[in-house]
Curated annotation (Swiss-Prot):
SMART domains per the UniProt record, alphabetical: HYDRO (SM00075)
GO cellular component, one term: extracellular region
InterPro entries per UniProt: Hydrophobin, Hydrophobin_CS
Protein's name according to its UniProt entry: Class I hydrophobin 2
Subunit structure: Self-assembles to form functional amyloid fibrils called rodlets. Self-assembly into fibrillar rodlets occurs spontaneously at hydrophobic:hydrophilic interfaces and the rodlets further associate laterally to form amphipathic monolayers.
Cysteine disulfide links: C28-C89, C36-C83, C37-C71, C90-C103
Listed GO MF terms: structural constituent of cell wall
Record's keyword annotation contains Glycoprotein: yes
PROSITE patterns: HYDROPHOBIN
Compartments (UniProt record): Secreted; Secreted, Cell wall
Length: 110
């Protein structure tokens, strides 16, 4: 009798103690963060992206996600905007879309 009780308590404790996956940290605040970028690349210290990040005093190591260049906001309301390049959801937008960081590709089926 005691063995069954202890086994049940031990299994219940184990089930509660098992870690779960954390919620995703990169969530899109659509439609506010949806953008159409002419170029989307991994952050690097070299080339145009490295130069722009350096001018903004942003360390490549601090960036999670991709970097978008020449991005324009996409409005889901009204249907006037369409994206012929890469649709992304970006966390930060600098200089009116010249460079956006923390971008995640989005697939929009119309």
């Amino acid at each position: 009798m005691q063995f069954k009780f202890l086994t049940t308590v031990a299994l219940a404790t184990l089930a509660v103690a098992v870690p779960t996956d954390p919620p995703p940290t990169n969530q899109c605040n659509a439609p506010n963060n949806l953008e159409c970028c002419n170029s989307v690349q991994a952050p690097t210290n070299s080339g145009l992206i490295g130069t722009l990040l350096g001018l903004l005093n942003i360390s490549v190591g601090d960036i999670t996600g991709l970097v978008g260049l020449t991005c324009n906001p996409i409005s889901l309301i009204g249907g006037g905007n369409s994206c012929n390049a890469q649709t992304v959801c970006c966390q930060n937008n600098y200089f009116g879309g010249l460079i956006s960081i923390g971008c995640t590709p989005i697939i929009i089926d119309v």
